[in-house]
């Protein structure tokens, strides 16, 4: 992914979200059709390092000390980009309960649901997971995604990778 440089990305003042969600829907549908439930392990990196690297010059950086600070940075960044209206999270016993409100990807999730493809990835949650990983030194895995009309609830597990 090193060839994806910020300089090569055209600057746009407006993105057609209907088009973007349709393309994302088709990509996720095709991946699920070919990999089944294993598709979630192929999409867990979407929205992590690539987003952070791309927006670092604009101030997107994550702390290595506080997952709460990273939650706030992630939420603020996604709100500024017009991706979500809010993100909240609580972590207890290595289990994170995340709520993402008014995400631009909700219509895409509805299209997947209509094709009987269960929700298996969440790009905003992946970015938050990266912030949690940076602060805690633990790995993360999205265990469950419940989509709703106005919000999604995500359960994310934290675990220490064994050598």
Give the residues covered by each predicted segment.
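N-terminal accessory segment detector
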Residues: 1-120, 139-153, 157-163
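Active-site helix/loop of acyl-thioester processing domains in fatty-acid/polyketide metabolism
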Residues: 118-137
